[in-house]
Amino acid sequence: MKAYQLTIPVENKPCILAQITSILARKKINIRSATISSFGDSGFINLIVDNPKQGQKALRKEGIAVELKEIITVLIDDRPGGLDELLQILCTENVNIENGYGFVIESRKNAVFVLDVKDAERAEDVIKASGFKTLTPQELSEIEPFHYVGY
């Protein structure tokens, strides 16, 4: 089963992110993960939401350009070298990562690495054949957030 993220090209100026989150909030779409990157006057917002197709529809209805991108979410060990193991396998198989980011989860004491690649099916086959677990959209939406304790 495929997972998706919303990728939104944006101008680098105040209130853009708030405009996007407001639209999604009004439609009761929950944001599970967000990354924001800018380069000069523009950038991208990547969102994993609980209903990506409805999120895309809501944003487009408000005139916001948005792409629904297939992603692979991989469960990795949260330890030094955990991400490197995955990336070395993908490198050996010549899989180019166009976009990627990760986050730690408490429920499994692991991390999730999100990959955006051109050939997701082949990349997912390589990942699974190497013993890594990929998360279904349902598993992704049910992740409990990691809570830092003991500041």
Where are these regions (language model features)?
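A conserved regulatory-domain signal marking ACT and ACT-like small-molecule sensing domains
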Residues: 1-151
